[in-house]
Structures are given as structure tokens and as C-alpha cells.
Amino acid sequence: MAKVSVIVPVYNVEKYLKRCLDSLINQTLSDIDIICINDGSKDSSLQILEQYAQKDSRIVIYNQENSGLSVARNTGLEHASGEYIGFVDSDDWVDLDFYEKLYNSAKNNNADIAVADFIREHPNKKPKRLKLKEEKIYTTPEDKFMICKVHSEGCVWNKIYRTEFIHSINLKFVPKMYYEDRDFTIRSLYFSKKLVTTPNTYYRYFVNPKSIVNKRRNYIQDEHYILVRQQVLQFIKEHNIKVPDGLYKAEIYRYKLFGKTLFTIKESINSKYIFLFGKIQIFKMRLKNNG
């Protein structure tokens, strides 16, 4: 059994895939599985995967019809047999000591989840980073939610998860859903017994202008954006998780700002966008009424 199974969904990323795979096959922690899910790529991504798999037996390829990121990750979860599970998007990359440090941190502290730093790499902007100060254990939902910034980030790729823990709560990604990380993240953080932070190693998130979430938004993405953020706040309230008041105020501001933005662009004139704007206003009122 490998120490970490790394799940890599792949869809039309021929330009960036080698960089991603090179960062994985050269990890200082060599005892890893690299589970690549080819999600119906139409470019040369599959050929690149096959070339790497011929040279490195740790790379396993599963092919499926294009079904989206959530389904691809779920396929990876079905085949993951490592002690821990990690996720890497195929246009991103990781520091070479990334999984060694995460695994040692999780193992030494008997943690269900280990979380690392990340850098958001933008082609034309200064990198944005999450900077963890120290290795520290967190056990309460409130602390885990705040250190992982679930209200603004909620990502799965800068973490590893104990496989047994993920299977014990039957945790999967919601199919056909944009921003699918958020639901997985809040549930894993809430139900985990222990989380440990792992500083000084980075997941490199590449802001790819051609990726799904960075393309010109459509009304489905906008609706999912609203629904996912709503789920976070509802989950916090339903499970009586105490978070700073500023979190709710920040969320209300996001909805208000987002609604105004939708209303100023041409596409917002159609009924679907008006429906979304109405939903934002309704949810904002609910938040105010709930304190």
C-alpha cells in the first residue's frame, strides 16, 4: 500500500500536464500512487499520460467519457488504495517535498487531514499565498474552518486525507457541480477528529485563463457559486459552529456585490439572471434575520 494516492483529473491540458507530472514523479516521498483520470480529453493529454506511464509504473491511467471534475475525482477515490489521498489539478504543480512533509506531519500527529501552504500563480499578477506559520493541531470545527478559510477558499488540493476516514463517512464530490471543493471540504473538516497544519511547502495553483472556473461565467456557474456559498453558511448554522460575526458580514457583502455585478452586464437582462439576482437578495435577507 502506498503512503499517498494522488488523484489527478485530466482534461485538455496538454500545455501544462508535463509540468504537473514532473512535480509528482520527482517527489521526495517516492512511495506514492499517481492516479490519472483522463476525462475524455480531445487534445494530446492522453498521449502524454501514456508516455509518462511507460516510464513510471506508479502512474495509472483510467479513461472515461467527459463527465466533469467531480466525477473524475470520484473515479479516483474509487481506485485510491494509499494510506492517505491527495488531489492535484492537472494544470497545477507541487513542491518536490510537498507530499513527504504532508505525510510526515499527518502520520506523526495521527491526523485525519494535513493542510499545507499554497501559492496562487497568475500569469500577469503577483502570486497570492496562504502562509501557515507553524505545525499545529486543530480539533474543533471552528478552528479547522478558520485556518482553512472555508468561507473564501475551501479547496481540497493543498491537503491530504486519511483514506480510511474518507471512506468511513462515505465522502464524495457532488457530480455536475461547479466549485465542488467546498462541500467536500466543509464535511471533511467537520467530521475529522484532528487536522494538522504543515508550513514551508507549497501547492502551486495556476490561474489558467482557459480553465472551467476562469472562463466567461454563465448563469449555471453563477447559480452554483451562490448555492455553494449558501451551503457553507447553512452547514455552519445547522451544526452550531461558532465563527466570527465578520464572516457573515463578509458573505452578505459578497452576495450584494455579486448581485450588482450581474445586474450591470448585458446578460443579466434575461430572466435567468434576474432569477439569480432575486435569490441573492432573498438569501441576504435570511442571513440578516438569522443574525
Language model region names:
Residues 18, 43-51, 93, 97:
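Acidic helix N-cap motif at the loop->helix transition within catalytic regions
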Residues 85:
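Short aromatic/hydrophobic "clamp" motif used to bind/position activated sugar donors
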